């Protein structure tokens, strides 16, 4: 698609990122680049076992190593011993049991990273190795003893809707397995902690998605009032959900407070795999009952999400999964049973798509089975069942969001297909990249579809809000917010909002930290809506006061004033003055807290208005498959996405293309391999990621139907691109091979054998 540049960087323009040039030139300061005078290095000792009782921990040898300044364990935590986003069930340091491979046991601070490594190697831990719980079904059926005082089931949620005895002549069912995906951000976890001179407080620079929630959890563990813990956003090298949970924040701060010196911690790639949560692996069974003309009558489903050792956000991920069972389709009757379990596998939590990725993989596989059973085209079967604004969902909630599902499907279908592979293709166009061993005669093409809906913002009664301040001074504007910039582009959007409302081009933003009210997490596709709403509200308050000032000076009713480009005008008269002139020697500052409409918890039958709003998307995938080698080349992805209103076209395209790449990874290559509770591939050597050679042609149609509930009509676009692209690619592989493949990622052996 073509993106045009407008004259001013206001809403609707493809404004350039303020940090873009620095990042391209290598001048941007990421959190791993931070340094302080007299700084120590910190490091963490981790368990090599997925489940064991700690008999003893001997630190004496570590203390004797020259350069070691501090060694700490659970006994040195001055405040609360556990933390967590929803349930505070995860220890700062394991004291009696380790419940997953990589769980922290101790931390050290020393003069050099190599000294830290020597100190960790010197710590002696005696374990009694226990049988790990690795099968979520054993957590459910009770055949394994509880591995945590809170039990092995984090949450169970049923949905019972309509007539559960309803039947129909066409029945299709399947069991779908979704692998454990890593967020695989390029910038690993890092933080720099600076203790106050009096030891009564601390400042921490950290790459995170939620500054205020980190501060809240840290303060409890440090035994400090929240106002004594200041967090500043360090440059973030990707997030995708993994930075919602605490990782090294408390450890770094504890070491700094104990040594009274700055301490920096930074994970290597392997440690990063153990230091953050991943996407939940899941097994989902679904049965669809439909009429002979393909209309869904009832859905039955059972979902099991493996949450790993601690709860993190598993309960919320489960709710997203079960409430999206139907997908973007009408369903008058449903019975769903969902579990999030504890095991001794790696902890799982937030990742882009947040439970909907797993549900969508299953319901789109079912739609393809339904198409085959009825003899109806894959596109037509979806069109016959699409949900509309005003339709009820299986939770009883009425869909209030603008729901252009039909447009998504039809506009995707209208995008051009790629040309057929030539009889003598370039080797890089063959499955496998270099393709030197590929035989053109064994390569077949397939086409597949995926359609999805994704909730926006937090759900189930969470009091979600965001705060922003706008200060107009001498013809320029400074914005203040705590919105974590993790690459999504809010630092570009916020000034665009201010320019559009105030008619001032000189807009900057202050340090992103906890010196203002919370902005919530940069997740759930919420920041354009929530923090955008806060910036919009603050700027409108400033404009209101500006109009009052101009009206008083020039004798005009403020209600008659408006903004025309960079001028203030009398909307029914001839008065005009530049905003620059009108604001000379003037200071106005306003703070605004934006809340979305309230939601509610689900009841025992899964009924309730638990979500705020939804976005919709369709994907069509074209793949080439080498039947002999089991290799896949994704040739093209076509997509039409419901974006509400496009505020920055270039940013939207970037989000869509990035989401497609992440969904492609889950479809054909990305999976953390866990056996007996142990991660077998904690590196980018063995955990495969899409590269530029794997990137397909991407065709995008942005569907603009502004949502009246949204502050500027815009819906968040971050998560939807990665959800239905995975089932679309897998469907295309099924179409090419004729095999019934109901897992992702698809492995070569799934194709060849």
Residue ranges and their predicted role:
Residues 1-150, 171, 258:
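Flexible, low-hydrophobicity surface segments
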Residues 13, 18-25, 151-191, 281-365, ...:
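Glycine-rich loop/linker segments at domain edges
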Residues 18-22, 121-130, 134, 209, ...:
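Extended active-site and interfacial segments that coordinate phosphate-rich ligands
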Residues 74-75, 223-228, 257-263, 292, ...:
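C-terminal catalytic domains of large/alpha subunits in multi-subunit enzymes
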Residues 78, 141-222, 387-476, 496, ...:
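Helix-loop-helix junctions that connect adjacent transmembrane helices in secondary transporters/permeases
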Residues 81-86, 119-122, 215-217, 240-246, ...:
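Short acidic, glycine/serine/threonine-rich loops at helix termini
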Residues 94-97, 225-227, 231-233, 257-268, ...:
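Conserved catalytic cysteine-centered active-site region
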Residues 237-260, 264-266, 490-497:
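Thiamine diphosphate
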């Amino acid at each position: 698609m073509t993106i045009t540049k407008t004259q001013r960087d206001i809403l609707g323009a493809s404004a350039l990122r303020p940090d873009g040039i620095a990042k391209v030139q290598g001048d941007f300061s990421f959190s791993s680049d931070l340094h302080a005078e007299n700084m120590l290095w910190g490091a963490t000792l981790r368990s090599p076992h997925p489940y064991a009782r700690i008999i003893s921990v001997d630190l004496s040898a570590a203390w004797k190593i020259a350069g070691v300044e501090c060694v700490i364990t659970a006994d040195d935590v001055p405040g609360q011993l556990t933390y967590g986003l929803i349930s505070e069930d995860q220890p700062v340091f394991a004291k009696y049991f380790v419940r997953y491979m990589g769980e922290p046991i101790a931390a050290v601070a020393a003069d050099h990273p190599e000294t830290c490594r020597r100190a960790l190697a010197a710590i002696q831990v005696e374990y009694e190795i226990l049988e790990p719980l690795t099968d979520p079904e054993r957590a459910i059926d009770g055949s394994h003893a509880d591995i945590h005082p809170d039990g092995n089931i984090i949450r169970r949620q049923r949905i019972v809707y309509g007539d559960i005895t309803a039947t129909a002549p066409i029945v299709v069912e399947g069991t779908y397995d979704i692998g454990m995906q890593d967020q695989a951000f390029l910038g690993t976890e890092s933080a720099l902690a600076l203790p106050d001179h009096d030891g009564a407080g601390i400042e921490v620079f950290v790459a995170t998605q939620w500054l205020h929630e980190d501060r809240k959890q840290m303060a409890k563990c440090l035994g400090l009032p929240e106002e004594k813990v200041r967090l500043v956003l360090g440059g973030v090298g990707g997030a995708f959900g993994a930075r919602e949970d605490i990782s090294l924040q408390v450890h770094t701060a504890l070491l700094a407070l104990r040594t009274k010196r700055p301490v920096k911690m930074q994970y290597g790639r392997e440690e990063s795999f153990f230091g953050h949560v991943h996407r939940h692996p899941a097994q989902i069974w679904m049965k669809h009952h439909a009429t002979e003309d393909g209309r869904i009558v009832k859905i039955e489903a059972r979902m099991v999400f493996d949450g790993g050792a601690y709860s993190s956000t598993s309960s919320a991920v489960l709710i997203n999964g079960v409430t999206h069972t139907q997908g973007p389709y009408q369903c008058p009757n449903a019975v769903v049973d969902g579990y999030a379990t504890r095991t001794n596998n790696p902890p799982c939590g937030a990742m882009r798509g947040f439970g909907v990725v797993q549900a969508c993989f299953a319901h789109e596989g079912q739609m393809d089975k339904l198409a085959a059973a009825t003899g109806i085209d894959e596109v037509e079967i979806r069109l016959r069942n699409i949900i509309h604004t005003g339709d009820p969902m299986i939770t009883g909630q009425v869909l209030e969001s603008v729901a252009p599902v039909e447009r998504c499907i039809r506009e995707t279908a209208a995008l051009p297909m790629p040309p057929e592979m030539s009889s003598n293709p370039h080797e890089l166009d063959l499955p496998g990249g270099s393709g030197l061993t590929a035989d053109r005669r064994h390569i077949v093409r397939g086409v597949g579809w995926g359609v999805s809906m994704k909730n926006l913002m937090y759900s189930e009664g969470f009091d979600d809000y965001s705060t922003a301040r706008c200060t107009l001074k001498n013809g320029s504007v400074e914005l203040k917010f705590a919105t974590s910039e993790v690459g999504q582009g809010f630092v570009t959007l916020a000034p665009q909002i201010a320019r559009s409302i105030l008619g001032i081009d000189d807009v900057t933003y202050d340090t992103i930290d906890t010196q203002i009210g919370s902005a919530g997490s940069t997740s759930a596709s919420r920041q354009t809506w929530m923090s955008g709403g806060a910036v919009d509200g603050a700027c409108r308050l400033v404009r209101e006061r500006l109009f009052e000032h101009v009206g008083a000076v020039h004798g005009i009713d403020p209600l008659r004033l408006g903004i025309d480009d960079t001028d203030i005008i009398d909307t029914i008269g001839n008065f005009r003055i530049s905003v620059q002139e009108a604001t000379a020697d003037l200071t106005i500052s306003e703070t605004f807290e934006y809340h979305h409409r309230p939601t509610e918890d689900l009841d025992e039958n899964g009924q309730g208005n638990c979500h705020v709003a939804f976005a919709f998307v369709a994907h069509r995938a074209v793949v080439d498959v080498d039947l002999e080698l089991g290799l896949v080349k994704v040739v093209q992805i076509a997509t039409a996405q419901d974006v509400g209103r496009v505020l920055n076209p270039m940013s939207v395209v970037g989000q869509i293309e990035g989401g497609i790449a992440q969904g492609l990874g889950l479809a054909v290559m990305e999976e953390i391999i866990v056996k007996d509770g142990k991660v077998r591939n904690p590196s980018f050597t063995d955990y495969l990621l899409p590269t530029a050679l794997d990137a397909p042609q991407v065709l995008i149609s942005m569907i603009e139907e502004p949502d009246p509930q949204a502050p500027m009509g815009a819906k968040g676009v971050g998560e939807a691109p990665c959800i239905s692209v995975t089932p679309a690619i897998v469907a295309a592989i099924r179409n090419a091979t004729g095999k019934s493949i109901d897992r992702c990622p698809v492995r070569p052996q799934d194709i060849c054998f």
